[in-house]
A protein has these predicted regions:
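Exposed, low-structure sequence patches enriched in small/polar residues
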Residues: 2-234
Length: 234
């Protein structure tokens, strides 16, 4: 509902089937293993209400809250793999469980021509996983779920061919049985320079704070790390 040129009140509801094929499993957890083809995940509902505003040229605000319910949601947990020689090796197993969460978030974006842009987002989630059979699967399903996520990102174009960026990513995990995984705190910086049309060199430095955290169970993130390369656009 547009009650002025700069204010929008909205409501939305969506859902659908998420096929757990190889590509989605690799995106979810590149180290995870499955014993059989997982069932599709169904987003049974994802409903939200929100408020958007653009009080100044180039500035956008978005406040929202909602509820999401997922059937056969993916999660990973440590397990042991038994070999033919009855030897056990640690592994990361991908499982499924029904989860739901209530969320609330805010977003602010600002851009000045093609010279400078800034964005900041934050989302809080309160997760639940009903566990009727008293197994540990319900607890495992929530261990790496994000309780709060925050992103800050700045892009600067000092000249048209050069892009510099600086950002910060924070993820705090859901508390399960009185404990929670260390939060992700990734301060990063990067750049991209197009020296010929369609040909660019890029570089990025991650974990500038040299923090100890994990995106996947049992796989600690490296300290300060660097990537770079050449990209081609055809």
């Amino acid at each position: 509902y547009n009650f002025s040129d700069i204010y929008i009140l909205y409501a939305q509801a969506k859902g659908g089937r998420l096929q757990n094929d190889f590509r989605r499993l690799e995106t979810f957890c590149p180290y995870g293993q499955v014993s059989s083809q997982p069932d599709a995940t169904y987003e049974q509902i994802n409903a939200a209400i929100g408020f958007k505003a653009s009080p100044a040229i180039g500035l956008w605000l978005n406040l929202y809250g909602g509820y999401q319910n997922l059937k056969d949601d993916l999660f990973f947990q440590p397990a042991d793999l038994e070999s033919a020689a009855n030897e056990y090796s640690p592994m990361l197993s991908i499982g499924q469980w029904n989860t739901s969460n209530i969320y609330a978030g805010a977003e602010i974006r600002y851009g000045y021509k093609n010279v400078f842009s800034f964005s900041a987002t934050g989302v809080y989630r309160n997760w639940d996983a009903k566990d009727d059979n008293q197994s540990n699967a319900g607890a495992y399903a929530l261990v790496y779920k994000p309780a709060f996520e925050a992103d800050l990102h700045i892009d600067v174009h000092p000249v048209s061919a050069l892009l510099l960026n600086l950002g910060y990513r924070h993820i705090s995990r859901e508390k399960v049985e009185g404990n929670k995984v260390n939060a992700v705190n990734n301060l990063y910086a990067g750049g991209n320079y197009e020296f010929f049309k369609g040909i660019s060199v890029y570089a990025r430095i991650d974990n500038l704070l040299n923090q100890d955290y994990q995106y996947y169970w049992g796989y600690p993130t490296e300290g300060i790390n660097f990537t770079g390369g050449v990209s081609f656009k055809f």
